[in-house]
């Protein structure tokens, strides 16, 4: 049995994670679209950029809220380059959602917490966004609307999906991996792109979590680990899409 603690055993890997995140390349949105074959072959999926995670409520996080401006800029830039396919996935929970046993009650259906943030809802093309409320971390579980939408995009020629939102290790990870793994299972080529500038996760320090009787959540570590894991599975992870 190795008596060294995890921090010591994994020191080299943690250094690697630091270097990986610090060295993420910047990518050109225009070039991503061109490589896909044009804007008609690109779709953007916006995951949980809603009030209850970005602005107010039991699970709102200031660090998560910081992704709102770059996400709005990305959507505007994609629109200006001709991308018209945008889907919004939103936590919109039943009042007795089983998920509330793991996470404090949040983003209940019909509340302001479950609404898209104003910065995105106020975009000139927001009325064209496909809107998918969800009752679980993964929108691929419990109903077929999102998976049917994604499959429909592929059937219409979409080859590249850009995923942004929160949280890196939860809903964003589930969304990006579902797109990639579904394509793999069908023996199809699909490009999934995640810009670190437009994804984030929350932080709950150990001492605070212990006082609350909750599980701690190291935001910096888990953000880095899940960016790594997305890249490990073939998702293109970049620092930002300029």
Question: What is the predicted role of each segment?
Answer:
Residues 51-52, 93-95:
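Short, solvent-exposed loop/turn segments at secondary-structure junctions
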Residues 45-46, 50, 89, 195:
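Generic enzyme active-site microenvironment
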Residues 97-101:
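Metal-dependent catalytic neighborhoods of phosphoester/phosphodiester hydrolases
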Residues 58-65, 103-111:
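Short coil/turn segments at secondary-structure boundaries
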Residues 40, 44, 57-93:
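A short alpha/beta connector and helix-capping loop motif
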Residues 49-57:
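Short acidic, Gly/Ser-rich segments with clustered Asp/Glu that frequently serve as metal-coordination loops
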Residues 1-43, 77, 94, 105-242:
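Active-site-adjacent betaalpha module
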């Amino acid at each position: 049995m190795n008596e060294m603690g995890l921090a010591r055993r994994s020191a080299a890997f943690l250094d690697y994670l630091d270097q990986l995140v610090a060295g993420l390349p910047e990518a050109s949105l225009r070039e991503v679209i061109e490589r896909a074959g044009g804007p008609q072959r690109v779709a953007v999926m916006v995951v949980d950029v809603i009030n209850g995670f970005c602005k107010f409520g039991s699970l709102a996080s200031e660090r998560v809220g910081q992704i709102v401006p770059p996400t709005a800029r990305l959507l505007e830039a994609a629109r200006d380059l001709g991308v018209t396919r945008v889907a919004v996935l939103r936590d919109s929970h039943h009042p007795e959602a089983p998920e509330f046993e793991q996470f404090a009650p949040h983003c209940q259906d019909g509340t302001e917490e479950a609404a898209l943030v104003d910065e995105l809802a106020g975009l000139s093309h927001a009325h064209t966004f496909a809107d998918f409320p969800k009752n679980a971390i993964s929108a691929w579980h419990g109903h077929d609307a999102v998976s049917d939408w994604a499959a429909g995009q592929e059937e219409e020629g979409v080859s590249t999906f850009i995923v942004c939102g929160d949280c890196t290790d939860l809903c964003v990870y589930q969304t990006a991996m579902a797109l990639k793994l579904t394509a793999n299972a069908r023996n199809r080529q699909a490009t999934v792109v995640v810009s670190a500038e437009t994804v984030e996760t929350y932080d709950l320090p150990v001492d605070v979590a212990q006082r609350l009787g909750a599980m701690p959540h190291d935001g910096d570590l888990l953000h880095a680990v899940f960016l790594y894991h997305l890249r490990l599975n073939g998702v293109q992870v970049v620092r930002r899409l300029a």
